[in-house]
Amino acid sequence: MFKIHFRFFFSHGGTEQVHNYIVKTPLNNVLAQRRSKSYRRSMRSCVEATNLGYTSGHLTVLRIPRSRRTPKSRDITKQVDPDQVALLVRKEWELSYVTPLYQFRHTQLKSYSKHLSAFIVSEKQQGLAIEVGQELGFKVNFSVVLGLAETDEDAETVFIQILSRQAFAAKDDAQKVVWSGWLTCVNGDLEFLRSLPSEFVSLPLLCTRGPESLTVLVKSWFEKTFDCCFGPLGINSANLQWLAALWIGCHPTINIQYLKLVWTLPTLPPMDVKYTIHPQDAWELWDSVRQDDTTDVSIEEVTRFIKGLQSHFFRHFRIELSAGSLKQVSTALGSSHHSGKIKIASPTYITTILQLLTECALLKMPI
């Protein structure tokens, strides 16, 4: 028998209520539930749901993982420049998937910086709205973030910044960053990456931050230059559950401070339920559903953990959270929203999160 401290917040029909509770739960109950255009056309012709990747000569099946490695605490700044790490963490990013880039070369980043800058200025001169004020011009910086790649097949991360100076700024005023984005691949599917033709580079995950109009221009330039295509990358309920479990698994080495889950229930009008659990209680529940002390976490363990939380809630409120959809997960280590937004608050477990997002991007691609 152990206790779970949790806070319950719900909004329904414009009314909001908050409740705090301590509930005792028997452990055995939880345990019982325990590149050419022809290449792009050929990719688009595949059905997304099949998760088949077109490569030169054969189809590669991209399988949904049923287990993942337990998170390992690691000082990423020993591998990656701390200044570059600071650019990635403690910011909210919008996620997209990217199909393989044709003839992309990490050695040509300086040239790409000039060409993208000229493209943005050209589009602005044609009267396209940029929505970042009255700027004199744009400067683009491409750079490589060395050290995030986990395997030899992973391409190194590319970081992009767009800077601009306001029209009425003093001459010596520094340009300010108006848009940021990065393309990455962390522990990508080896079979898929190895089967790509040598002319293609796979950086399937794009994270962006800034005006949507600039995001559209950046994507447009990439599509024209590297014959690729982009799409929104939402994070479904199953992957949000994975994130919750992986973050809870970090608690023994770093205090996650809280676990907040948001469900949307299919009522009229829809009801949002915000469910905040004390981190130690969440960890004890997680520890109780773990089958053994292995280095892997299985989907069955994640399912039992979420069902355990749902059973706590149902026992007290008679509200069946499983009837709804998990929309958001938050801890002190980061947060994620089903619409495709992610915030990584700590660099300690950044590779664990990026690996999961890389998998999501590869599975989402229409190839």
Question: What are the roles of these predicted feature ranges?
Answer:
Residues 163-247:
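Internal, hydrophobic cores of structured domains that mediate oligomerization or house catalytic pockets
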Residues 2-192, 341-367:
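N-terminal low-complexity/intrinsically disordered pre-sequences and tails
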Residues 227-327:
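Terminal interaction module
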